[in-house]
Amino acid sequence: MAAKQLIFGDAARQSILKGVTLLTDAVKATLGPRGRNVVIERKFGSPNVTKDGVTVAKEIDLKEPFENMGAQLVREVASKTSDVAGDGTTTATVLAYAIYKEGLKYVSAGANSMDLKRGIDKAVEAVVEELKKISKPVVDKKEIAQVGTISANNDVSIGELIAEAMDKVGKDGVITVEEAKGMATTLDIVEGMQFDRGYISPYFITDPERLECILEDAFVLIHDKKISTMKDLLPILEQIARMGRPLLIIAEDVEGEALATLVVNKLRGVLQVCAVKAPGFGERRKAMLEDIAILTGGTVISEDIGLKLENVKVEDLGKAKKIIIDKDNTTIVEGAGDPQKIQARIKQIKVQIDETTSDYDREKLQERLAKLAGGVARINVGAATEAEMKEKKARVEDALNATRAAVEEGIVPGGGVALLRCQKALEKIKFENHDQQLGAEIVKKALEEPIKQIIANAGVEATLIVEKVKENKNINYGYDAYAEKFVDMMEAGIIDPTKVTRTALQNAASVAGLMLTTEVLVAEIPEEEKKPPMPSPDMY
């Protein structure tokens, strides 16, 4: 086991401060509409150009171990905020630095660090309550576009694309971000339920030009086992052939005699049919088949519930207005399921999302939710170069996360104004002692930092502008750093999601409080690299 080095008390906290300062200086340059770029070296390929705070923070590792601890703690603030709210990482970093730096002055002067932390926590609770009062719900497409635009560094086209995508697939829909092949950034909408299984045999194709099988006003047979013999399928196929309606068969697999018979009947024009494999695996497959059954108003034909394939009636089949199958995907449009049952299933999946601890399971549940709730949208990000593409894709993902957060908890005035307006909420709180009161003063001062940094990044003197904003009684009055003028932030479309602002402050205060109450730092003593011995003269 390697030997350890320890430092205590004020020396430990000062080392943390050095690391926090270095990381914050790198990250805060990206804040606001006039934020600067940070260029990050890559081992291979072109450097990464970014204005995303968490991307910068994740790249920083300091040589000095004690300073690095401080940097890593604040890095945690940025990544936690990104995980929960999807944006606000730079704001969180700036707030954590401001709270810690100010708090350290009082701790060094003899204040009780535990009381300071209690005061900070109490003040943050009051600010969060005030944010909820200021917050207003997002009601229309225009506001969604504004949130997206702000988060994408004032790129209006990205904001409008995200608003369009949300309008089409709803707030529970899945919106994915992909790299496009060309220079244009486009939006593709997949309406209905799509799953990643195509036709089992190309003989099922009905549109040879597009290599698709299209079934209009079709029945859907859903089975959870393999179908290999024809005698089980025969009764239901005869009924459907008499009705002259198309049929989609979804099963674990269709093979041998059963597949051959379906293909022959399709080619002879006796039956318009297509077979696809069931999506997913194991328990997830059962759940997805149940989703398809609920969406189409059918029943999963499973021996688990006493249903056999040879006894299937037309009433057990699902129905859909249109089904499109290509070699990779099946899309079911306008299933005939009972809307109440679909809503009940959506609620059930939402509960599972809240309860699961696995990120992978959560992602898969959200995909299922979206497929039931109305569809999938895909934003294809195009750019001239690979470096620009990566930077733009990161901005689109940020904007998408911020927009979701806005729909969830509403919006507040942007540009750091909302936090500044929350200062007045701290004047009403009663504290048990003077040190706790100081904790609230620390938070009060820190609430000014984001707006100051946004203005400073625009190359303007911040102090006078902040005072002018404070003096104005209109809660939405603030400074547009992009246009360099005073405006009503809500009317100008400069808005932040409440969830992003709240999460940034809570995470910043949490980590700053931990650092203030730190007394000892323990790190490994770095081993000196041993130099190789001098070569023997006889070697030459």
Swiss-Prot record:
Residues involved in ATP binding: 30-33, 51, 87-91, 415, 496
SUPFAM superfamilies registered for this protein in UniProt: GroEL apical domain-like (SSF52029), GroEL equatorial domain-like (SSF48592), GroEL-intermediate domain like (SSF54849)
Chief localisation class: cytoplasm
Catalytic activity line of the entry: ATP + H2O + a folded polypeptide = ADP + phosphate + an unfolded polypeptide
PROSITE patterns associated with the record: CHAPERONINS_CPN60
Location of the protein in the cell: Cytoplasm
EC number(s) stated in the UniProt entry for this protein: 5.6.1.7
InterPro entries assigned to the protein according to its UniProt record, in alphabetical order: Chaperonin_Cpn60_CS, Cpn60/GroEL, Cpn60/GroEL/TCP-1, GroEL-like_apical_dom_sf, GROEL-like_equatorial_sf, TCP-1-like_intermed_sf
GO biological process terms, semicolon-separated: chaperone cofactor-dependent protein refolding; protein refolding; response to heat
Key words of the record: ATP-binding, Chaperone, Cytoplasm, Isomerase, Nucleotide-binding
Cellular component terms per the entry's GO annotation: GroEL-GroES complex
Gene3D superfamilies hit by this protein: GroEL, GroEL-like equatorial domain, TCP-1-like chaperonin intermediate domain
Cytoplasm among keywords: yes
Cross-referenced Pfam families: Cpn60_TCP1
MF terms (GO), sorted A to Z: ATP binding; ATP-dependent protein folding chaperone; isomerase activity; unfolded protein binding
Family the entry assigns: Belongs to the chaperonin (HSP60) family.
Annotated HAMAP family: CH60
Assembly notes: Forms a cylinder of 14 subunits composed of two heptameric rings stacked back-to-back. Interacts with the co-chaperonin GroES.
Stated role: Together with its co-chaperonin GroES, plays an essential role in assisting protein folding. The GroEL-GroES system forms a nano-cage that allows encapsulation of the non-native substrate proteins and provides a physical environment optimized to promote and accelerate protein folding.
Protein name: Chaperonin GroEL
Protein's organism: Thermodesulfovibrio yellowstonii (strain ATCC 51303 / DSM 11347 / YP87)
Lineage: Bacteria, Pseudomonadati, Nitrospirota, Thermodesulfovibrionia, Thermodesulfovibrionales
